[in-house]
Amino acid sequence: MKSGPGIQAAIDLTAGAAGGTACVLTGQPFDTIKVKMQTFPDLYKGLTDCFLKTYAQVGLRGFYKGTGPALMAYVAENSVLFMCYGFCQQFVRKVAGMDKQAKLSDLQTAAAGSFASAFAALALCPTELVKCRLQTMYEMEMSGKIAKSHNTIWSVVKGILKKDGPLGFYHGLSSTLLQEVPGYFFFFGGYELSRSFFASGRSKDELGPVHLMLSGGVAGICLWLVVFPVDCIKSRIQVLSMYGKQAGFIGTLLSVVRNEGIVALYSGLKATMIRAIPANGALFVAYEYSRKMMMKQLEAY
């Protein structure tokens, strides 16, 4: 069966959803630690301290707070990201005056990923907001910033709708865009350059799961080294806007640097770097293999 644009988009969307699911299931505990340290750096001395205190306060389940929204966030983001990635590759070919079937360079592929991330940000922002608030609910309650409440997905969603209406789900959208667009240039660039390195003259499609895992890990590290300070500001805006009007990106950035120093922008970086290899490796292994499987099934008809 011939693969039309609609069928190809559906395959990319489904494979992206599989990748997003694998990413969350692999890296959620470290993501929780990252968000806690970004939002409340004064409460924790480091990664180990945050881990031990979280376990002592709320047990193992504390590391999986926000897993539901995280699954929704990453499945939504990666579904849209990889679906639009195919369209954006065609856009890059058109701009570069290339044939529709021409192979893109690694840098051109990175540019396509960057364009696709702008669309993914619109799907990511609402679910990321709910996830971050759930992950830091304990700290918000203990610091007296909010009253004790039922910290469930539905209670957070109702709180956002009641306080800010539907647009409240887009607190931190500008920060998300500032993070996603440049970040995914380095994400896809790092992934494709790593695959080219491991392929060593062979086709990239011949790479096995270990090399795909390592390439995904490099992609994640490239992404987070570039955008981590922006992600820190995004987390602050999304969490702290829960109890009052929060300054925008520039205002929050200046406040953090002035009151806590530049180092505060990198609080939680270690947890993110540890998470990057297994989580992003799992993302690309799941994406590549599920996509190959669906393409084979399509060709069999």
Swiss-Prot record:
Annotated Solcar repeat ranges: 7-91, 104-197, 207-293
Organism phylogeny: Eukaryota, Metazoa, Chordata, Craniata, Vertebrata
Molecular function in Gene Ontology: antiporter activity; L-arginine transmembrane transporter activity; L-lysine transmembrane transporter activity; L-ornithine transmembrane transporter activity
Effect annotated for changing V181G: Increases ornithine transport activity
Mutagenesis / variant outcome for changing Q179H: Does not significantly change the substrate specificity
Protein name according to UniProt: Mitochondrial ornithine transporter 2
Tissue expression: Expressed in liver, testis, spleen, lung, pancreas, and small intestine and expressed poorly in other tissues.
Principal cellular location given in the protein's record: mitochondrion
Pfam family, one: Mito_carr
Compartment(s) where it occurs, according to its Swiss-Prot or TrEMBL record: Mitochondrion membrane; Mitochondrion inner membrane
Catalytic reactions on record: L-ornithine(out) + L-lysine(in) = L-ornithine(in) + L-lysine(out); L-histidine(in) + L-ornithine(out) + H(+)(in) = L-histidine(out) + L-ornithine(in) + H(+)(out); L-homoarginine(in) + L-ornithine(out) = L-homoarginine(out) + L-ornithine(in); L-citrulline(in) + L-ornithine(out) + H(+)(in) = L-citrulline(out) + L-ornithine(in) + H(+)(out)
UniProt activity-regulation remark: Inhibited by pyridoxal 5'-phosphate, N-ethylmaleimide, spermine and spermidine.
Gene3D superfamilies hit by this protein: Mitochondrial carrier domain
Entries under InterPro entries matching the protein: Mitochondrial_Carrier (IPR050567), Mitochondrial_sb/sol_carrier (IPR018108), Mt_carrier_dom_sf (IPR023395)
Similarity comment text for this entry: Belongs to the mitochondrial carrier (TC 2.A.29) family.
Outcome reported for the amino acid change (mutating Y74N): Does not significantly change the substrate specificity
